[in-house]
């Protein structure tokens, strides 16, 4: 959840019984922590509850790949046993994590990526649907579940989960759980700016648009006057650069570096003057800034209210406590 996953938020989610997922670039670049010390801080704040780590594993840069490998190794040394991978082949992460008894779930938006993840040995899939913030998929939650159900792995619903009703609907479809981003930005612990949080509270589904101006591919953001002035499509030079194989590599690197700065600045800027605010359609169900733990507990209570599911139960994952293996 770059750039909003600060240590206090991640720890609060875990302390309440969820799995707070740290984002290493957010932890180090946005919030200024040494990676290892940041993990130790989150363990301390959460009371030693399980933490997860997001490993964006696209291999466009050798330097970035080496840094991500080091981050994964440090996280494992510090007892992290749950990893969410995205944008690449997760095999090397799976090998390292399974060696110590951990679990790897992989972000997917369609069947071909799910099959590649399964072939790499991942333990579950994060099914990113078209209601998600950031880089959303193209299918509804139900369509994606139906497409992935026979892969044979637990499925987590990502996108559109802003209130208990949406959470229960995901479980009733057959998902083993949900992943939430936008809902946790509008919390007391999140360090995102007040204008960003207020924009989430004020937005409806129709206020979520997809812009190519940040990363070169569509990203779900809140429609604002700034977004409307900038437009939603990448410029002609960028589109040309993204078409060639070699040019595409360099253009995506430029976009990645620029977007890190843009999103960091926009998320922390209290003036809201240049507001690239990532969010999904779950904004429709978010009406208050609340403690993260209260949200987790309320959703858990709603989940327990489902007395009987028409779908077979999914086997509970292995123990994810720090150090468990």
For each feature predicted by the language model, list its residue ranges.
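Active-site entrance/lid segments in N-terminal catalytic domains of soluble metabolic enzymes
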Residues: 1-154
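Conserved active-site-proximal phosphate/metal-binding subdomains
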Residues: 140-154, 162-325
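Short hydrophobic "strand-cap" motifs at the C-terminus of beta-strands
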Residues: 158
């Amino acid at each position: 959840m770059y750039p909003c996953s600060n240590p206090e938020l991640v720890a609060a989610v875990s302390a309440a019984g969820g799995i707070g997922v740290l984002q290493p670039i957010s932890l180090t670049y946005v919030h200024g922590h040494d990676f290892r010390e940041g993990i130790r801080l989150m363990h301390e704040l959460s009371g030693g509850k399980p933490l997860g780590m997001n490993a964006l594993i696209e291999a466009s840069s050798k330097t970035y790949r080496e840094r991500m490998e080091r981050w994964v190794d440090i996280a494992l040394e510090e007892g992290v046993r749950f990893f969410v991978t995205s944008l690449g082949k997760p095999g090397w992460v799976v090998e390292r994590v399974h060696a110590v008894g951990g679990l790897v779930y992989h972000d997917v938006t369609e069947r071909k990526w799910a099959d590649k993840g399964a072939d790499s040995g991942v333990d579950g899939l994060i099914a990113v649907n078209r209601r998600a913030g950031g880089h959303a998929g193209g299918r509804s939650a139900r369509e994606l579940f139906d497409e992935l159900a026979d892969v044979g792995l637990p499925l987590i619903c990502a996108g559109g989960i802003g209130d208990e009703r949406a959470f229960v609907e995901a479980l009733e479809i057959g998902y083993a759980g949900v992943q939430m981003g936008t809902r946790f930005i509008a919390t007391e612990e999140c360090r995102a700016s007040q204008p960003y949080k207020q924009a989430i509270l004020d937005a409806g589904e129709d206020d979520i648009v997809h812009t190519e101006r940040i990363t070169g591919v569509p990203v779900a953001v809140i429609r604002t006057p700034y977004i409307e002035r900038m437009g939603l499509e990448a410029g002609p030079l960028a589109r040309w650069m993204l078409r060639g194989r070699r040019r595409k590599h360099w253009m995506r690197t430029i976009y990645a570096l620029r977007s890190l700065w843009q999103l960091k600045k926009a998320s922390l800027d209290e003036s809201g003057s240049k507001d690239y605010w990532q969010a999904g359609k779950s904004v429709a169900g978010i009406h208050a800034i609340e403690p993260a733990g209260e949200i987790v507990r309320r959703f858990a209570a709603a989940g327990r209210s489902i007395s009987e599911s028409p779908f077979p139960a999914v086997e509970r994952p292995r123990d994810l406590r720090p150090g468990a293996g």
